[in-house]
Amino acid sequence: MVIANSNIIFVAGLGGIGLDTSREIVKSGPKNLVLLDRIDNPAAIAELSALNPKVTVTFYPYDVTVPLDETKKLLKTIFDKLKTVDLLINGAGILDDNQIERTIAVNFTGTVNTTTAIMDFWDKRKGGPGGVVANICSVTGFNSIYQVPVYSASKAAALSFTTSFRKLAGITGVTAYSINPGITKTVLVHKFNSWLGVEPRVAELLLEHPTQTTLQCGQNFVKAIEANQNGAIWKLDLGRLDAIEWTKHWDSGI
């Protein structure tokens, strides 16, 4: 996908990985970058606008846990303004296994609902033009961090949803791929709660291992966007971008 002159919606594009990815996207010159986030960050939005004045950067407050109909209303506002949207990035995520319901609501249900909502505007069965979805999942969808099983399971669920959804492209006209960062130096991983307190030092232990910066992750994210491979399972780890070959152990046969 060519980012230049495109219209992109980025859910949670003002966080750690999100903000550095937004910077890299803006450098590539989209026509519009629409940021949907729970918390406003005027300084970051001003920075992004100044980085490339030819890009229109817009912010709308959005919590991915709202009912599906509210998401549809917000997207209608955006589509009424832009007319077309080329790419939806679902990037909302929390890491706190003390908050079981919210972890599932943000990391999994929010991704499903935002994707479902945009189908009203993209699905070719409804006369839509199609589009592209990039879902930020996690390497924990491959192998869990067992001390945070709720987080790991929520990301595995988001990955499974994405791998199923991309197979529907022939029916819907909408393609999809997953972005799976490894341990990245963000606020998210500096301090978080393990499930039932099974490992109070889990954040500290993780950070003893090699990590990557949000800039490295953002740069590789843009490479994945440009590659635009339907069904790709991208691993963004240690400053590298690698396509994962999924091992098939079972097939529904339908």
Curated annotation (Swiss-Prot):
Its EC number is 1.1.1.1. PROSITE patterns: ADH_SHORT (PS00061). It catalyses: a primary alcohol + NAD(+) = an aldehyde + NADH + H(+); a secondary alcohol + NAD(+) = a ketone + NADH + H(+). One of its GO terms (molecular function) is alcohol dehydrogenase (NAD+) activity. Substrate binds at residue 138. The active site is at 151 (proton acceptor). NAD(+) binds at residues 10-33. It is an enzyme of class 1 (oxidoreductase). This is Alcohol dehydrogenase. It comes from Drosophila adiastola.
